[in-house]
């Protein structure tokens, strides 16, 4: 199975400025993400950035880079520009790996690519079991509900599924979305033609527009650890501690 990994790597970050260049035991954060991706089964890994500083650092550790516009509003639109610049075939499988996921296991990247390749759905993504009630109630933790065929029914920042009777509360039914996606190049291009749904506008979740347009998203529990993503300083501290 052939697939490419594209890592959107935006320089600006309001909560942790220049986070992708933060040092983690002698390496910039983006390099850790890249190394995990290069150790997957991907044919190639491309870092899509909007900043010369990231491009220079990435080139120094041997990465293939593609400069993109600084005004993209999502990683998906940044990836679409890469597809155009590099003239990537419409049927190629693309895995979108966020640049701030330095502990993402390579096997998880392979899993989501394979799930798309063996499914009739247009997107594949992953989830993890929610382990405590605080996480279940946290609006920063995106929840997903899916059917027995792995088809996403809804994504929400709200606590879903809702347990009408307190005695029925069961974390085994609760899953958080993991923000890694696989899709074919043609679908990324088509996504950019979609108008944002009302659900995306209120929840700030772009995958809701995909569901609203009638496309299917395959969801499966991740086969291995996802680790800490880095949004704020305490996340970076956790990564440094775990990798020490």
From Swiss-Prot:
E.C. number(s) listed in UniProt: 2.7.7.38
GO cellular component, one term: cytosol
Catalytic activity: 3-deoxy-alpha-D-manno-oct-2-ulosonate + CTP = CMP-3-deoxy-beta-D-manno-octulosonate + diphosphate
Subcellular compartments: Cytoplasm
Recorded superkingdom: Bacteria
Principal subcellular localization: cytoplasm
GO biological process terms on file: CMP-keto-3-deoxy-D-manno-octulosonic acid biosynthetic process; lipopolysaccharide biosynthetic process
Signal peptide stretch: none
EC supergroup of this enzyme: transferase
GO molecular function, one term: 3-deoxy-manno-octulosonate cytidylyltransferase activity
Keyword DNA damage: no
UniProt entry keywords in alphabetical sequence: Cytoplasm, Lipopolysaccharide biosynthesis, Nucleotidyltransferase, Transferase
Pathway terms, separated by semicolons: Nucleotide-sugar biosynthesis; CMP-3-deoxy-D-manno-octulosonate biosynthesis; CMP-3-deoxy-D-manno-octulosonate from 3-deoxy-D-manno-octulosonate and CTP: step 1/1; Bacterial outer membrane biogenesis; lipopolysaccharide biosynthesis
Keyword match Transferase: yes
NCBIfam families for the chain: kdsB, PRK05450.1-3, PRK05450.1-5, PRK13368.1
PANTHER family hit by this protein: 3-DEOXY-MANNO-OCTULOSONATE CYTIDYLYLTRANSFERASE, 3-DEOXY-MANNO-OCTULOSONATE CYTIDYLYLTRANSFERASE, MITOCHONDRIAL
Protein family (similarity comment): Belongs to the KdsB family.
Function of the protein: Activates KDO (a required 8-carbon sugar) for incorporation into bacterial lipopolysaccharide in Gram-negative bacteria.
HAMAP family associated with the record: KdsB
Annotated protein name in UniProt: 3-deoxy-manno-octulosonate cytidylyltransferase
Species this protein is from: Ruthia magnifica subsp. Calyptogena magnifica
Organismal lineage: Bacteria, Pseudomonadati, Pseudomonadota, Gammaproteobacteria, Candidatus Pseudothioglobaceae
Gene from which this protein is expressed: kdsB
């Amino acid at each position: 199975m052939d697939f490419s990994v594209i890592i959107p790597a935006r320089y600006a970050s309001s909560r942790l400025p220049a986070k992708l260049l933060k040092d983690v035991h002698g390496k910039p954060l983006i390099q850790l993400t890249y190394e995990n991706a290069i150790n997957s089964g991907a044919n190639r890994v491309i870092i899509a950035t909007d900043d010369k500083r990231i491009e220079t650092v990435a080139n120094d550790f041997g990465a293939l880079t593609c400069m993109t516009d600084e005004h993209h509003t999502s990683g998906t639109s940044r990836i679409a520009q890469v597809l155009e610049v590099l003239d990537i075939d419409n049927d190629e499988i693309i895995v979108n790996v966020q640049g701030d996921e330095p502990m993402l296991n390579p096997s998880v990247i392979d899993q989501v690519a394979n799930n798309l390749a063996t499914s009739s759905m247009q997107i594949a993504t992953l989830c993890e079991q929610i382990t405590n009630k605080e996480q279940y109630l946290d609006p920063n933790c995106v929840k997903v509900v899916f059917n027995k065929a792995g088809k996403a029914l809804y994504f929400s920042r709200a606590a879903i599924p809702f347990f009408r009777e307190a005695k029925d509360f069961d974390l085994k039914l609760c899953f958080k979305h993991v923000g890694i996606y696989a899709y074919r190049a043609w679908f990324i291009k088509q996504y950019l033609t979609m108008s944002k749904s009302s659900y995306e506008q209120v929840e700030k979740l772009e995958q809701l527009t995909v569901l609203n347009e009638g496309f299917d998203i395959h969801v499966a529990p991740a086969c291995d650890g996802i680790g800490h993503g880095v949004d704020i300083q305490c996340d970076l501290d956790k990564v440094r501690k775990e990798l020490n």
